[in-house]
Design a protein with these regions (language model features):
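Structural preference for solvent-exposed beta-strand-turn elements
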Residues: 1-147
Length: 147
C-alpha cells in the first residue's frame, strides 16, 4: 500500500512539473460556492477533512485518532475477514508515501467516526477532492509559478 502512495506521488510530481499555472493549495472547495471551505467528506458516522499544498516540501499531518478512538477501531478491524480487510494503519503509510514523493504538505484529519471502512473511505475521498482542486489551472496565474 505504501508503494502505491509512493508511485502515485511520483506520478503527481512528474505531471505537475514546475507547477506553472496551478492553484497549488487545495482545500477541495467548489469555486461556484466558495463558502464550502475545506474538503469535508461525510461517510455515515464519520467526517474527514483534508487540506493540501503542492509546495515542494513534504510533510504529513495525520490527526484525529486519539488512543480512545483507536480502541474502538481495532476491534472492528479484527472482525473483518482477511479478504476484505484493509488495515487502517496502511492508509497512513499510503499518505506518507504520497506526501514524500509528491513533495506536498498534506493535512488529513478525522473529525469523528468509528467504522474503519468508513474512516478510510472518507479520508481518501477528502484527499481526492483537495488534490483535484490544488492541481487545477487557475487563469489568474496562467503561466506563472504559484507562490
Amino acid at each position: 500500500v505504501e508503494d502505491c502512495g509512493i508511485a502515485l506521488g511520483q506520478a503527481f510530481a512528474q505531471a505537475l512539473g514546475d507547477k506553472r499555472g496551478i492553484r497549488r493549495y487545495g482545500a477541495g472547495f467548489d469555486p461556484r460556492n466558495p463558502f464550502t471551505g475545506e474538503s469535508y467528506v461525510p461517510m455515515d458516522e464519520c467526517l474527514a477533512r483534508c487540506v493540501i499544498d503542492f509546495s515542494g516540501r513534504s510533510y504529513l499531518v495525520w490527526r484525529g485518532l486519539n488512543p480512545l478512538g483507536m480502541k474502538k477501531i481495532l476491534p472492528a478491524e479484527k472482525k473483518q475477514d482477511a479478504s476484505s480487510a484493509f488495515r487502517f494503519g496502511l492508509a497512513r503509510e499510503f499518505f506518507q508515501g504520497f506526501a514524500n514523493e509528491a513533495r506536498c504538505n498534506l493535512h488529513l484529519e478525522l473529525l469523528y467516526g468509528d467504522e474503519p471502512h468508513h474512516i478510510v473511505e472518507a479520508l481518501f475521498k477528502a484527499f481526492a477532492k483537495a488534490a483535484d482542486f490544488a492541481c487545477q489551472h487557475d487563469p489568474r496565474i496562467a503561466g506563472r509559478i504559484p507562490s
